[in-house]
Amino acid sequence: MGCIKSKEDKGPAMKYRTDNTPEPISSHVSHYGSDSSQATQSPAIKGSAVNFNSHSMTPFGGPSGMTPFGGASSSFSAVPSPYPSTLTGGVTVFVALYDYEARTTDDLSFKKGERFQIINNTEGDWWEARSIATGKTGYIPSNYVAPADSIQAEEWYFGKMGRKDAERLLLNPGNQRGIFLVRESETTKGAYSLSIRDWDEVRGDNVKHYKIRKLDNGGYYITTRAQFESLQKLVKHYREHADGLCHKLTTVCPTVKPQTQGLAKDAWEIPRESLRLEVKLGQGCFGEVWMGTWNGTTKVAIKTLKPGTMMPEAFLQEAQIMKKLRHDKLVPLYAVVSEEPIYIVTEFMTKGSLLDFLKEGEGKFLKLPQLVDMAAQIADGMAYIERMNYIHRDLRAANILVGDNLVCKIADFGLARLIEDNEYTARQGAKFPIKWTAPEAALYGRFTIKSDVWSFGILLTELVTKGRVPYPGMVNREVLEQVERGYRMPCPQGCPESLHELMKLCWKKDPDERPTFEYIQSFLEDYFTATEPQYQPGDNL
């Protein structure tokens, strides 16, 4: 959110629509859950005890060869999603997947591998637990633990992770051939996929995916001639022998420690004194962004809003919705100071805004494959917002944040509609982002997910031009007039025409003719296999 913003109408054209979209949730309702397919979830532990080592799945029939499916190349870091589970308190022993340093006196510090009994797991994101080693009790983040001796506790198990995110992780610089992970299958409920980094002379570094099937008697196999009682034994076998795979499994794919869901238990509306502003990262028309520390323990980003920017009551109501939007391509909202001046506390992203990254950082040297992959990540996050029936309203490079390994996350979703500034609400002047805004939104205030699609098309031009201001040489009033007459930006220098065609789809005059974000995500993720397989790097891209 700043001096610029974006919007447009909902209702995808039929050729882009799919039938498996989750039921949408109104953005004005404050009690909905995150999308189960993509959100960074906490385990749901409730109800009766279950066997965590039982993995029911649809059996597969018939023999199978060692033919991998899929494949790709790119770079990114993702967080493995925790397992879904249920239990009654204290029966199952849990094991720590990561180290955790206590942030409050009520928290419990622990090391990876430490074991716990869960005392109270009714709180969702934070559980009361007792360390078996020390006897100490305290709250722990529920997405940092898994049932001991379950598949979720294995280092190589990455849970709900899509093919593309697996490829981004495995293809990170420094990873070697044979590095691997196991994840849930995207296409077959209850099944698994083995993803391995490979290399060949034609494709260079790439990733191969093998489907792990289940026998009627409960065993697992990739090929029927080699069957195993458990996934653990299957992985152990292929770590010792390639046995038909593209390469023997070597080391487990490294990953980053996931973000906790919130700063701590009950840390939502926090006192201003608990925050220390340390390094000013930027400023805009409505406030500043700082790197800071919460409670003397936790690095965070803090957005400070100028008094009068928005009504505190309206902000708090919207923030309650925003904090429920959970997806690994959205910057998580941790906490708020709800009295003016309003503070918004979020995850700190190491590389700052995408706009600055492209203009002044490492982004200046990126080639088209990396830029398209970043666009695909943004589309992934926007597809989630689309499924949740929410609207961003200010989608542009300045509101995308970049982390390590070219991770992109969407920030400031939903805040633009709360701005009280007269110049902004009149959709005129320097504070309003005319150049990113769909005409029906700029002229008539009709902001929908389809105006976000228009804005995404503008964001694509920012990516391929390394942060150039859209419509170069034109002032806001001229842009609005020319766009209404049918003018659209020409193909940027070095940009493939196929990518410009996607931009023009986003800029269709009729909002209903613009593609869905689901379509855009699919198009960009498969861009170099389906659309531009003969891509050769040029001077700029």
From Swiss-Prot:
A lipid is attached at residue 3 (S-palmitoyl cysteine). It catalyses: L-tyrosyl-[protein] + ATP = O-phospho-L-tyrosyl-[protein] + ADP + H(+). CDD domains: PTKc_Yes, SH2_Src_family, SH3_Yes. The keyword Endoplasmic reticulum does not apply. Residues 26-37 have a biased composition (Low complexity). Keywords: ATP-binding, Cell junction, Cell membrane, Cytoplasm, Cytoskeleton, Kinase, Lipoprotein, Membrane, Myristate, Nucleotide-binding, Palmitate, Phosphoprotein, SH2 domain, SH3 domain, Transferase, Tyrosine-protein kinase. Residues 1-20 have a biased composition (Basic and acidic residues). Its main location: membrane. It is found in: Cell membrane; Cytoplasm, Cytoskeleton, Microtubule organizing center, Centrosome; Cytoplasm, Cytosol; Cell junction. Its EC number is 2.7.10.2. GO terms for cellular component: anchoring junction; centrosome; cytosol; Golgi apparatus; plasma membrane. Residues 156-253 form the SH2 domain. GO terms for molecular function: ATP binding; enzyme binding; non-membrane spanning protein tyrosine kinase activity; phosphotyrosine residue binding; signaling receptor binding; transmembrane transporter binding. Pfam families: PK_Tyr_Ser-Thr (PF07714), SH2 (PF00017), SH3_1 (PF00018). The modification Phosphotyrosine is found at residues 424, 535. Residues 89-150 form the SH3 domain. Residues 1-43 are annotated as: Disordered. The active site is at 394 (proton acceptor). One of its GO terms (biological process) is cell surface receptor protein tyrosine kinase signaling pathway. Non-receptor protein tyrosine kinase that is involved in the regulation of cell growth and survival, apoptosis, cell-cell adhesion, cytoskeleton remodeling, differentiation, G2/M progression and cytokinesis. Belongs to the protein kinase superfamily. Tyr protein kinase family. SRC subfamily. This is Tyrosine-protein kinase Yes. It comes from Gallus gallus (Chicken). The lineage of its organism: Eukaryota, Metazoa, Chordata, Craniata, Vertebrata. The gene is YES1.
